[in-house]
């Protein structure tokens, strides 16, 4: 195709071939495998060579209508040059936007696609104003805040009894006062001996009648003489001590003592 005096050749063609016979590239077959020319070549009424730059994006059925708007607004030669400077993986996006801009320019020769941009911006402004109005309306409809409940009085904490700390070795007195050097330990043993002897004598006095063979009749007679039990008991004690070989203690009573016959 001749566009502006330059022949358009591109790499990576396909999708459509040149109609009417064999082609120099492809061994006598058509450039697109016998499917007919691409939409761009069909609109331009030219032979679609293998590697046509428009073939991947404009098919032979509906591509002619889209390419007509592109050619009218931008020109086929300018679009082919633009696509050659774009990476292959981004050319599809470029073709879509070019077609959109071309159709918008045909519908609105003054603003083109900018008219659509202005309409979207105005829509955003209207939506923001509506959101602000709704927020203010909701703020006026909010229920009053409930009254804060009085804080409960803090309950008195129970008093816990703190046990005294355990005694340690350090709590003991540093020194213990020793016994006086003049203290006579023999007196302790003498007192212990005398107390044990006294306890032994008391045990002997528990039942003197059985120990010394005194009959119950004679003892009862002796105790009952004169009707004075205290003097009889005292006399009996003197008699028993005399039999054991101990001198009887001095009598404290000046009344005459009664003795028992052996």
From Swiss-Prot:
Q: Any coiled-coil ranges, and where?
A: none
Could you mention a single GO BP entry for this protein?
A: xylem development
Print the keywords alphabetically: Nucleus
Major location category of this protein: nucleus
Q: What is the effect of changing residue 109 to L?
A: Loss of function in lateral root formation. Abolishes DNA-binding activity. Abolishes interaction with GIP1
Q: What's a Pfam family in this record?
A: LOB
Q: Where does the protein end up?
A: Nucleus
The annotated phenotype of a deletion mutant is: Reduced number of lateral roots.
**Annotated S-S bridges:** none
Q: Where is the LOB domain?
A: 36-138
Ranges annotated as spanning the membrane: none
GO cellular component, alphabetical, reads: nucleus
The induction comment states:
By auxin.
Report the InterPro entries cross-referenced here. LOB (IPR004883), LOB_18/20 (IPR017394)
UniProt-annotated stretches for the region Disordered: 223-262
By sequence similarity, the record places it as follows:
Belongs to the LOB domain-containing protein family.
Miscellaneous note, as given in the UniProt record, is:
Plants over-expressing LBD18 have a dwarf and bushy phenotype, with short petioles, curled downward leaves, ectopic shoots from the adaxial side of cotyledons, shrunken root tips and disorganized columella cells.
Q: What is the purpose of this protein?
A: Involved in the positive regulation of tracheary element (TE) differentiation. Involved in a positive feedback loop that maintains or promotes NAC030/VND7 expression that regulates TE differentiation-related genes. Functions in the initiation and emergence of lateral roots, in conjunction with LBD16, downstream of ARF7 and ARF19. Transcriptional activator that directly regulates EXPA14, a gene encoding a cell wall-loosening factor that promotes lateral root emergence. Activates EXPA14 by directly binding to a specific region of its promoter.
Task: State the oligomer form and interacting partners.
Answer: Homodimer and heterodimer with LBD16. Interacts with GIP1.
Protein name, per record: LOB domain-containing protein 18
Q: Which organism is it from?
A: Arabidopsis thaliana
